[in-house]
């Protein structure tokens, strides 16, 4: 069992300075499934030990979680060292806590603070008319990779921004590639060609 932590760890080890450690509490307790209290499939030498954190460790984890739902590896390592829990277990704790929070927010129909609002900051979809599509398709048949001057000319003809023309060609190439199957490469053409002479 790890050593007991008495008092507060040095401030340099704990990224959450507001967390206070209670003196005399063991840093962590590990339980193993050696008796018949767990189902058979949960027992055995390959199973991970269950981590039971002390109240002070839980306080430290919660304080850091409230400050940042997605802490970086350095923060998790400092926290793990400060409360004497292995870093992978700290990472799993954060994943589990985010999952619980997300479930609670879904039940209460509140927006999840860890994700941006899908409608906020999203570009409005550009509507392309049939005549604009026909013009772009003709240009695509002539040249699937038009340069800037050609795209600017298409922008003038269609009234669409050049950046939208560029994206339309990228999307069309991706769709065309998927529908037509893989085009043969130059190397495969050379390898499959009949020998000369």
Curated annotation (Swiss-Prot):
One of its GO terms (biological process) is regulation of transcription by RNA polymerase II. Expressed in hepatoma Hep3B cells. It comes from the Eukaryota. InterPro entries: HD, Homeobox_regulator, Homeodomain-like_sf, HTH_motif. Residues 46-105, 121-180 bind DNA. Signal peptide: none annotated. Its main location: nucleus. One of its GO terms (cellular component) is nucleus. Pfam families: Homeodomain. Residues 102-127 are annotated as: Disordered. DUX genes are present in 3.3-kilobase elements, a tandem repeat family scattered in the genome found on the short arms of all acrocentric chromosomes as well as on several other chromosomes. May be functional despite lack of introns and of a poly(A) addition signal. Belongs to the paired homeobox family. PANTHER family: DOUBLE HOMEOBOX PROTEIN 1-RELATED (PTHR46123:SF3), MIX-TYPE HOMEOBOX GENE 1-RELATED (PTHR46123). This is Putative double homeobox protein 3. It comes from Homo sapiens (Human).
């Amino acid at each position: 069992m790890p050593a007991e932590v008495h008092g507060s760890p040095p401030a340099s080890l704990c990224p959450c300075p507001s967390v206070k450690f209670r003196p005399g509490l063991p840093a962590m307790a590990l339980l193993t499934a050696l008796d018949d209290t767990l189902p058979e499939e949960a027992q055995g030498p390959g199973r991970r030990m269950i981590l039971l954190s002390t109240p002070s460790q839980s306080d430290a984890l919660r304080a850091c979680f409230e400050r940042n739902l997605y802490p970086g590896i350095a923060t998790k390592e400092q926290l793990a060292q400060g409360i004497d829990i292995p870093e992978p277990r700290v990472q799993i704790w954060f994943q589990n806590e985010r999952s619980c929070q997300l479930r609670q927010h879904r039940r209460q129909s509140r927006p999840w603070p860890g994700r941006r609002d899908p409608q906020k900051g999203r570009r409005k979809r550009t509507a392309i008319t049939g005549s604009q599509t026909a013009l772009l398709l003709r240009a695509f048949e002539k040249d699937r990779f038009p340069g800037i001057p050609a795209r600017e000319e298409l922008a003038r003809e269609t009234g669409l921004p050049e950046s939208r023309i560029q994206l339309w060609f990228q999307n069309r190439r991706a769709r065309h590639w998927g529908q037509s199957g893989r085009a043969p490469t130059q190397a495969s053409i050379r390898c499959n060609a009949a020998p000369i002479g």
